[in-house]
């Protein structure tokens, strides 16, 4: 979801930079693409209505929201036999993002063993293919969500993430 209508949120505004009123855009619904972000120029070229995402450099999101799930973070942790909660990354999003390959360094995380937090981890590397992991390895999304810059995300549980230590 991209929503430029939310009050008092980073990147939300009543109008985009081309003067068109912002709205809530459903971009993907249950894994199916539903809409794309456009400005006046892009919309004209594609023969569609603008999505109210015009900026001086082309279309851009206002506030990206990954819709939350039903699980609580506490219940999600209890359901994990062995894993990590990642709170921070450094140098992340290297790899080939266009092909879905994402990797980076976990700067702050907590190790989970037997459904309990067992300690802190840092300076580990992670690697996923976002396309296949979110399609085939998504366990759950929490109902708790965190605002990070111009985005809001729940905690996401993924299976079979490659983690390396040094």
Residue ranges and their predicted role:
Residues 1-166:
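Dual-mode signal for accessory low-complexity, basic/Gly-rich regions
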